[in-house]
Amino acid sequence: MLRSEKPVAVEDIVNIYKESPSIIITHYHGLTVSQVSSLRESLKSKEAGFKVVKNTLAKIAANQTGLNSIVNLFAGPTAIVYSKEPVEMAKLVVNFAKANDNLKIIGGIVDNHVLDEHSIKELSKLPTLNELRGKIVGLLQAPATKVVGVLQAPSSSMARVIQAHASKN
């Protein structure tokens, strides 16, 4: 890389750090081009990205953005995976790493909290934000549908429900 290209590369990494609250640092040594392309495609479908970085430039960018706590994670053949949705990204990376031994998860950062490999694997087991929203909506709708069902029942059924509830108390 030419000296004149380095500031541009650092600026690209700085933008990734600023725009992505979730970053996973990986070692990719031994992955084939087709494997990296496959990973990039699956990440792109989830609005995430994969970027091979020079360690020195990644460290400079980390220092410029106040992410000093991840500087020591940059050693060896490093790539960063970045996204705004940490759980989906973690699931994709962990599953890909299970299928491809040459991708090693080193650590990462989510909302300025440094994570080690184990924490990223645990993060991947959590439900995504959309899954949680679906569960909450389902929980909120369940009591309402039960009340509507009771109200639509014949009056004799309603009387039995009230009688059963009164006998409980």
From Swiss-Prot:
Tell whether RNA-binding is among the UniProt keywords: yes
GO biological process annotation, one example: translation
- Mind telling me which Pfam families this protein's record contains? Ribosomal_L10 (PF00466)
SUPFAM superfamilies from the UniProt entry: Ribosomal protein L10-like
Would you tell me the Gene Ontology cellular component terms? large ribosomal subunit
CDD domains documented for this protein: Ribosomal_L10
Q: Does the keyword Cytoplasm apply?
A: no
A GO molecular-function annotation = structural constituent of ribosome
Q: Which UniProt keywords apply?
A: Ribonucleoprotein, Ribosomal protein, RNA-binding, rRNA-binding
Query: NCBIfam families this protein is in?
Result: PRK00099.1-1 (NF000955)
Q: What task does this protein carry out?
A: Forms part of the ribosomal stalk, playing a central role in the interaction of the ribosome with GTP-bound translation factors.
Provide the assembly information. Answer: Part of the ribosomal stalk of the 50S ribosomal subunit. The N-terminus interacts with L11 and the large rRNA to form the base of the stalk. The C-terminus forms an elongated spine to which L12 dimers bind in a sequential fashion forming a multimeric L10(L12)X complex.
- PANTHER family in the record, alphabetically? 39S RIBOSOMAL PROTEIN L10, MITOCHONDRIAL (PTHR11560)
Q: Which family does it belong to?
A: Belongs to the universal ribosomal protein uL10 family.
Task: Provide the protein name.
Answer: Large ribosomal subunit protein uL10
Per the UniProt record, the lineage of the source organism begins with:
Bacteria, Pseudomonadati, Pseudomonadota, Alphaproteobacteria, Rickettsiales
